């Protein structure tokens, strides 16, 4: 309770602050929240698709209502609300709902944008109502208790996460960034968790840790208390899983509703994760980092350890991210070692994985402080190990200690720490519970395992608890199992040591076994842990598949506990068994023995699990082998498995039948193949055996098994290497990597796991039969079985590699299983399917089981049976997988992927049994259907089981109601309708679930090839639906069918996944019986498999060696003898696989002979001993060919020489007479019987007709009477009602009369008053009408004014538009002009500047000009005055120069001035132009401004006018509205009246239409009845005609029988004459013989006259030994004459047995029924028309097809082609044409007697035939007697017509030969020589006999008339 204060603090801190904000903040206003989280800015994109976990009805219309299972589409989430509320749509309705009530199925986007909310987001989305007073979501949803519990859950989840974080900072780090697990508890925690709470969380976790430390200090009390509190916390935290647990009833501590809601989410995810991790890929198992899981999945323990930390960090993140989806809830196996290792690494790993799965039980482990962890480690190791060591006698402790210390000391410490708290707590808690190994399941599960899905944490705690119990249980179980196993091990070790002694490298077999056991032990223990967990899980799961998932955690715990025990037991077993077996085959052997011993207990489940795994493993052979190892289970587990086995068979039976069949078929086929392989090995030399191993192993197992046989260590290496190959496949998974590491650590384990996996398929199947309870023999045979299992493993591998035929065979068997699978899913069904499957599996298993497994422990048998039983569930998958493997479609890669899925499935198997019961209760239909854990877990992996259960329950209820309501004759149709509707609905929902689950798996990164698994799951759905359907329709029939085969239930359990776990008590007797039942198919299959394996052995051996290269291929290294010795037990072990006891005996004899020959050969001196081969050929084929040659020679001698005996006449006169008498008697009896039967038939028909007529009459009368009664009753009721009503009416009317009289007086008064009122009203009404008229007039005026105003308004609008357009145009012009003005102004400024320049220039020029003028004047004056001086100055050149220059300068200046003046003039002109333009633009601008002002004035005036008009309009509208109201009132009154009248009219019409319809229906019924009457009359007439025809035929038959009797009498007379002749001849012959030999020999063959002797008969006996039909006619009347020629005389009326089969047409046509038997049996004779033309086929040429013969028989037997005698038609009469007189020899022609001969044919030549014998015509009316037109005696005596030499008929072959003259001794004295008869070419037999035409005619006519 130390955590209580922490909880309170958390509650206060987390809940109160959140509750307060839940209340409406003033800031939020009329909103639930200020912000919402959307996928896009508009919140229009989908965020999630979910599924409602519970029904929800919102407090008002703002919330959306939904029911459980409804799909919910989420568009946005409200941010930071206490009860986290999402908004989404359900169907067409949109609204808010609490997040916790849905489970997210698909996430469309992970991006979340925070968008502010608006008040319009919180109105009713359908009607827009927004008058709500409360916007506090917490208060609105307060009616949901969810949130309280959710708060606690989230708090607890926070606490747990804190604990996990403290324990695993990496995990906490990883967890924090991973909010995606929102789907699980993370969403709740998201609302709860905030950055502010992290400190609190740390404090809380520290408090928790302290409390845990204290509690750990107090192991019994403190731990229990803290554990309980932690469990509570965990349950709260894991409410989602707990909801599952609550459902499973494992944890009732948490509020059911909250748990359910949260649990639904987590459940599905966890279930999928658990299922996947638990039995999916071994890689998943690796995730758990338990050595067991490592061992289970990856054989690489070292790799696992290395990956443990990495993976766990990653796994924690993944788990946190996926919280329940992680594949990490992988198998956690607690064994002697694994109990330690899981405790070690498992705790570290589990803290991450399990904590991540929010399994609070792990919290206990996780919360344990590091110091405590160390102590716990020591405690666990010392505690569990000491227990295990005590149990195992120290070997296991050594192994466990060494292995654990070496492989995972740290992990052990961690796991031990984590586990110790639980183990300590669990121990005191479960001391009582754990006391009984049988109770282990219960005890283990007694621990409150709130986390069912959180297998990781649960597993950790389970490791702890499992250690507690597991230790105790393992003590007990190990002690028990150890004793048994030690005995077995001793024997097995002795056997193996003897076998392997050569291979053991001089170490004592036991020591080597121990060493190998240690190494293998580590592996096997790890594997066993995994196996145990798988087993316990599988067992638990099988017990309650529904609960398994929910209780996945608890299951894993119990599984771990049991696994611990199992591991200990197995360790012991393996040590004992396995000193040798642990070697290559040790693990398989140990697995088998332990599987048989432990797995028989748990092994049943484990094996079933492992078997199914193995099936998958067969694909992933290596990977799955690892998983298959989990079969090992502790004795406790064994007990559990037994219970589980009991349940499992049921579960298995419930398994989808197809799967079961497939599984069983695959198992049986694989087993048979393995067995065959083993048998083949036994038969073959050691090399052949090795090859066989190699083939079976397919390069992996073979080498391993052989190596293991030869050298235990190398075998392990080879197996490890073999495992490496599969592990490489697994490497795709992290688990595979871990597996590699673990494999590197424990190569032996890998080998074992590999072998175990291989074994499991065999063993699982064999195990199913192994239930044969003989334990002690199993010790020795265990070793043998181990060897055989090695071989079988090799065979399994061979099956995988070369075993494609096995798959095909399995698939062949599957149909059988499928057929039976269709039966109700019950044990009986299982037994049926088992029966079906048993033929092969049964034989295989029974042989193994009966021979070897009988010796095996009953537990082993149980295990194997359980294995076989369970495997079927996955066998179907595995079958698919195997088929894929075999077919090469998806080799081991896909197989590995599928095994991963299976491993996932398997983890749930560890679910606690108690939970199962609860879950079973929840899932009645599914649990009753899935009686196998694996299939159920797989099913749960993909589907929401509860939703499907609800749908199935609904379907069942619908079917029930339909069944009850519908009539019996119509029931099936109604049920089918309901079934189809429900089926489509359920399948669509299931497909959606599957899609969502696949998408989730994809999101979670689970890359699995689940195609077959998904298909199998969908098949399961369909099977479930059909299961529910046929529960209601044919449940009784199916039940009877199912119940029939109790014996085969055991086998069936084994075969069909029934998991004879139930039938642990399978006795050998049952097995033997099953063996007896199964015997036939397996032998063929075995032979085929053996042949195939031999064929592929050689080719595959090198491959196997290559695969095995890593380990020394000990097969080759070891001496052949040793290998053979090893293989002999293997072969011996597998030989029993052939199912029948006879085969068992043969196999035993064969093995004994093989051994004896080997020993004899060994005794020979070396120089004489044969080499390995015979001139390059193997000895085996040489021996076989020699034996076959001798046997064939002997048979030839026997058939030729020895069979030759003195010839004795076959028939004597007495015999003939006796037979004739008997025949006559039989004939008379038959005639009497026929007549009696005919009379009876007639009477019965008459009775039938009478009864039918009576029934018809009675039924008609009954119907009429019923109708009359109904009508009378109705009339009576109506009359009674009317009478009552009339009485009441009378009384009421009387009362009313009194009242009415009073009322009348009052009414008169009121009438007067009313008249006054009426007058008043009339005046008022007239006034109102006047007012109305006025109003109408005014209204018209108003309307006209309105129209006018509207027109004016329209005109004004148009003017306004025009003005506006003009304004726009003017404004444009104005803008242009203003721009021009601006440009002009600029140009004006420029011109002004230019003018100033020009003015300046002008001034300058004027100055220049003035100066020039001045200068000119000066120059003139100077020139005049100083003319004389000029010369001087010029002479000087100075003065003159200056003047010139001045002049020039002045001239230039003047020029410049002139230029400037011209420029100025130009500029001035430009300026003038611009000024003109400016003036014009200014004037236009003024004009435009004036126009604009005018327009504005106009607009204002128009607006004023418009306002006035609008006012007028308003007033007019008001008037109009008033008038409309008046009119409406009047119209309403009128409409009411009209509606009333209309309603009355419609009622009248309705009544009339109803009456018309009734009249029409009545007329139709009358017509139908008339039609039926006519039909009945027609039928009666037809029946009368048919009966008359039958009477006529019977009369004809009676007449024909009479004729036959007459003919028989004549035939007897003829026979007497012949007998007299024969007597005479006999006397003559005897006299001659006596004279010759001087001996009184009555009858002796005449050597010189073969024709006097009956030739040796080649054909078989006749069907009943009576006189057969003549060889001529093949038992028919000879008319077609295309039959065999009569090869012997009349005297040769021999037994059919003496006649060659080919002579009477038995070759081609049906065997001719003996003439006598046909008549004696009362059946129409073959020749009779009644017998059909079946026998006619013989008469018409035998080569012809039956259809043709039938046609011939129908067409009056007229041949289709030319008649057999061309020129002489067969049917002389029908064919027309005179019949030539027959030529005859000898006495006058004999009539065709009933079976008598026709007149004798000509002498026997090659082309002729001897005359027809007396009975050589088919039974029936003598041919001559039937055709009255031709009297038989009308034929002339003489020779029968010879065959014309013209063209022969289509099937006639005329054999040329000299015609012999008629024999002197008489035509019928002797048969022709045997050479003539026997050596005739087939054509001669096929040609018709040259019988006389008369015979042909008579017979043909007889046949013609017979119809």
Swiss-Prot record:
Residues 155-258, 314-378, 390-601, 659-918, 1093-1121, 1420-1443, 1642-1907 are annotated as: Disordered. Broadly expressed, except in bone marrow and peripheral blood mononuclear cells. Down-regulated in melanoma tissue. Its main location: endoplasmic reticulum. Residues 1751-1907 are annotated as: Proline-rich domain (PRD). The modification Asymmetric dimethylarginine is found at residue 1784. Residues 1777-1809, 1859-1875 have a biased composition (Pro residues). Residues 179-201, 317-327, 407-419, 721-735 have a biased composition (Acidic residues). One of its GO terms (cellular component) is endoplasmic reticulum exit site. Residues 1145-1165 dip into the membrane without crossing it. Residues 155-178, 234-245, 337-364, 453-463, 470-483, 511-521, 584-595, 671-693, 771-780, 810-832, 846-863, 874-884 have a biased composition (Basic and acidic residues). Residues 246-256, 555-567, 701-711, 1650-1667, 1733-1747, 1892-1907 have a biased composition (Polar residues). Residues 1211-1650 are annotated as: Mediates interaction with MIA2. SUPFAM superfamilies: SH3-domain. Interacts with MIA2. Interacts (via SH3 domain) with COL7A1. Interacts with the COPII coat subunits SEC23A, SEC23B and maybe SEC24C. May interact with APOB and MIA2. Isoform 1 and isoform 4 interact with SEC16A. Plays a role in the transport of cargos that are too large to fit into COPII-coated vesicles and require specific mechanisms to be incorporated into membrane-bound carriers and exported from the endoplasmic reticulum. This protein is required for collagen VII (COL7A1) secretion by loading COL7A1 into transport carriers. It may participate in cargo loading of COL7A1 at endoplasmic reticulum exit sites by binding to COPII coat subunits Sec23/24 and guiding SH3-bound COL7A1 into a growing carrier. This is Transport and Golgi organization protein 1 homolog. It comes from Homo sapiens. The lineage of its organism: Eukaryota, Metazoa, Chordata, Craniata, Vertebrata.
